[in-house]
Amino acid sequence: DWWNHKGIILNMWEHFQKGVKPHADIPAPAPAKDLNQKWFDPQWRAEYLDWYVAHSSLKADILPVANTQLGPGSLAAILGGVFEGGEDTIWIHPDPDFNDEIVFNPEHPNWILHKELLKACKAKANGHYYVGMPDLMEGLDVLAALKGTDKVLLDTVMQPEVLEQQMQQINDIYFKVFDELYDIIREGDEMAFCYFSSWAPGKMSKLQSDISTMISEDDYRRFVQPFIREQCQKIDYTLYHLDGVGAMHHLPALLEIEELNAIQWTPGVGEPQGGSPKWYDLYKKILAGGKSIMACWVTLDELKPLLDNIGADGVHLEMDFHNEQEVEQAMRIVEEYSFSSPAASKESLSKEEAAATKQKTIIIKSPEAAEDEALKPLFNAIVDGKLEPAVEVTQKAIAEGI
């Protein structure tokens, strides 16, 4: 279980459709009339995402999930920020009337839009795939979207007590918003996030503070760390998005948060992507600190050297896949580490873990030649993205002591 620092997840940021045999006969909706419909019409987006998931590759651990994002940091829009739909994303502009009062209005149209979008997608999914949690964000990043980054940075000096109070207010509202949206999208207790094809067996959240590249370590510990810690204490599974080399000096403060499960590394503009040897020591430090890692935009050529250097436990790989042949190649590489990982011993693999039917890495003990033959159907089922046969073969293998 990757959240518990074991095994490998082989995944990608979102999905690709090229060369993929559809999973269901879902027609594409008529093209959006304009950017407003493309982003802010719940019914149109639900129909589009229904088509999107049906035509996306779901091999390896790529999750069937509808990306319901309403822009990065859409909690700011719920609190009064202004939406603007672009060609490839949604922008959230500061509230022109913001006066430092953090107020949640349950009748705000942007809050109503969040709920209507998720409900429309959930109805369309009908249990066949997950509906992702929007990218709400929190803390300083939300406040910066509401009033402007420069003003927030000034607040760290000019009105730090007010800023601390606002951070707590934003956190309190975050939990209210998160819980209500979770109740819409949940499948049992499980949920998925809109990005990273990321799943958890309970409540999960991606946390961040991109503005932290511009603040000191002391300010981070005052204005960010306590509120991230509170989120980690109240949400079962948490992943911190560490963005850019300018934010690396806050890693010690992150590792101090015992309840934080994992850290995702985004190198930033001008830097090599997440599979580069440049980041091996960073990953080792995070793993040694008791957190799982998520490495992004890893290429096939980088995959084996990365795993050779950092190990194969607690590693979530967001690959740079373009077609299903590349996914299958990566599966074969990862298979070697699943066989050899100490975490894959028979003693450490419970029957319940092996029978898990969601996004848990299926770990197999190192087989002898005869066992290799018996386990071929399992590997083939996983590569083909066929979940139920994979589970069935796993259960049979365990029963036979393979």
List each model region and its residues:
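Membrane helical hairpin/interfacial module
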Residues: 32-80
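Well-ordered mid-protein domain cores that form the structural environment of catalytic cofactors
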Residues: 68-105
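Residue-level signal for cytosolic alpha-helical hairpin/rod architecture
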Residues: 32, 149-150, 160, 372-376, ...
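Acidic, low-complexity proline/glycine-rich segments
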Residues: 85-89, 131-148, 353, 358-359, ...
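Short, solvent-exposed helix-helix connector turns and helix-capping sites enriched
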Residues: 41, 159-160, 386
